[in-house]
């Protein structure tokens, strides 16, 4: 496929994120991915989900896969920023993107179905067919991508097809549609075992979509400044 930016676009105003976007600090990438849209082509349909929740991971901290060492399965984590790293979690597929520096990456934790002239209601219907509820019925739109494995299931993303691959603007890419969260929630990551840097505030949530992420950081009992921090559009992330 040609590397010419015009010839490689799936439609004229598509804005695929370049590798340079990903080849930066994982915390920065994780935060700036909020509002971007994952697009995956299935036949003549472009399935799409807005990224609403991410988690950053680093080689040197104990919560990351990379901290366990290099293996052939984990090789995408050690490649340049912009490689796709997929693995199985709780019986489902999970989507990650490598970031700047060997072993650093961002996990796409949750999304929300995105509708526009490219990804229309037919695409949404396909996503609901791919990820029905436990009774086989169409899953509620707000819960369709509310978790890392639910997201991949609804988007039709599979480990064997995409692990260690690069983005392909004709098949799978992250689109900059011009959306920016007005407020971002920063909190500790989910599901990290005790003693493996579970306290690190490397999780980012688009505050407007907090109710649709894996676990609502604004739920009853959570206290600002203790359990999470609210960041404005220009505020620096916490270290």
From Swiss-Prot:
Species the sequence originates in: Pseudomonas aeruginosa (strain UCBPP-PA14)
Gene3D superfamilies linked to this entry: Methylpurine-DNA glycosylase (MPG)
SUPFAM superfamilies: FMT C-terminal domain-like (SSF50486)
Protein name: Putative 3-methyladenine DNA glycosylase
Domain of life: Bacteria
GO MF annotations in UniProt: alkylbase DNA N-glycosylase activity; DNA binding
Family to which the UniProt record says this protein belongs: Belongs to the DNA glycosylase MPG family.
Entry's Gene Ontology BP terms: base-excision repair
Alphabetic keyword roster: DNA damage, DNA repair, Hydrolase
């Amino acid at each position: 496929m040609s590397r010419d930016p015009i010839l490689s676009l799936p439609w004229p105003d598509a804005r695929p994120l370049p590798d340079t976007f990903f080849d930066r600090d994982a915390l920065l990438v994780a935060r700036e991915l909020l509002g971007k849209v994952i697009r995956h082509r299935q036949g003549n349909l472009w399935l799409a989900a807005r990224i609403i929740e991410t988690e950053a991971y680093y080689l040197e901290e104990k919560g990351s896969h990379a901290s366990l060492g290099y293996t052939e399965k984990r090789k995408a984590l050690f490649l340049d920023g912009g490689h796709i790293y997929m693995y199985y979690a709780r019986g489902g597929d999970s989507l990650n993107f490598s970031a700047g520096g060997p072993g650093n990456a961002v996990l796409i934790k949750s999304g929300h179905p995105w509708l526009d002239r490219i990804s229309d209601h037919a695409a949404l219907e396909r996503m609901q067919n791919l990820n029905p509820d436990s009774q086989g019925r169409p899953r509620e739109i707000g819960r369709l991508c509310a978790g890392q494995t639910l997201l991949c299931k609804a988007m039709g993303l599979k480990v064997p097809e995409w692990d260690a691959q690069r983005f392909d603007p004709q098949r799978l890419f992250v689109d900059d549609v011009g959306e920016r969260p007005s407020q971002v929630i920063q909190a500790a990551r989910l599901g990290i075992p005790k003693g493996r840097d579970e306290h690190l505030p490397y999780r980012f949530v688009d505050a407007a979509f907090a109710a649709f992420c894996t676990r609502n950081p604004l739920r009853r009992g959570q206290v600002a400044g203790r359990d999470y921090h609210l960041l404005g559009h220009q505020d620096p992330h916490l270290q």
